């Protein structure tokens, strides 16, 4: 299991990336949920070194391949002795970082039994993200979609978008801004 991070870590970043700036949904957020199947039998047969290169992070610590700790900055310019990028050009973490935007995200594991036709385990991630505009998510997905090595091991099965209403002020009610 890989540690999953690269979320906004400071209050200002939530304002910049997560909470809607104005209109009836000011201080609300967009929530996108995806069900992502992992072809676990293939992934489990993949060597640890290739798994880490696929993510661009170390499996145990979650650190970038150029760091030691989970929250160390990625050095996207670092090259090894043969002149290759330490974090490969098709690594998931590199590509997500290069999209030049941020979202609040979290993934939860799921298991849904086995496929009746193939006998393969139906397992993966329920990916949940929060962002001030759905375009942030779209930009990241477009950047990942064309080059991400992780796509060899996953299939997106379902997706939904929701709006999370802003909080309620004292004496107010949920959705009040929608009707004002």
Language-model segment annotations:
Residues 3-180:
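Long, histidine/aromatic-enriched segments associated with O2/redox biology
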């Amino acid at each position: 299991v890989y540690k999953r991070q690269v979320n906004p870590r400071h209050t200002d970043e939530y304002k910049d990336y997560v909470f809607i700036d104005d209109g009836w949904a000011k201080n609300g957020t967009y929530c996108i949920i995806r069900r992502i199947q992992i072809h676990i039998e293939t992934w489990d047969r993949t060597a640890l070194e290739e798994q880490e290169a696929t993510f661009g992070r170390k499996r145990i610590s979650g650190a970038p391949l150029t760091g030691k700790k989970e929250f160390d900055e990625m050095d996207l310019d670092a090259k090894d002795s043969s002149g290759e990028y330490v974090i490969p050009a098709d690594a998931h973490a590199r590509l997500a970082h290069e999209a030049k935007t941020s979202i609040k995200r979290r993934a939860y594991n799921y298991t849904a039994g086995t496929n009746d036709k193939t006998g393969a385990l139906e397992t993966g991630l329920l990916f949940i993200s929060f962002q001030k505009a759905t375009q942030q998510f779209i930009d990241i997905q477009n950047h990942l979609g064309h080059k991400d090595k992780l796509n060899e091991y996953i299939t997106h099965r379902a997706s939904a978008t929701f709006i999370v209403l802003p909080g309620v002020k004292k004496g107010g009610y949920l959705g009040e801004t929608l009707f004002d």
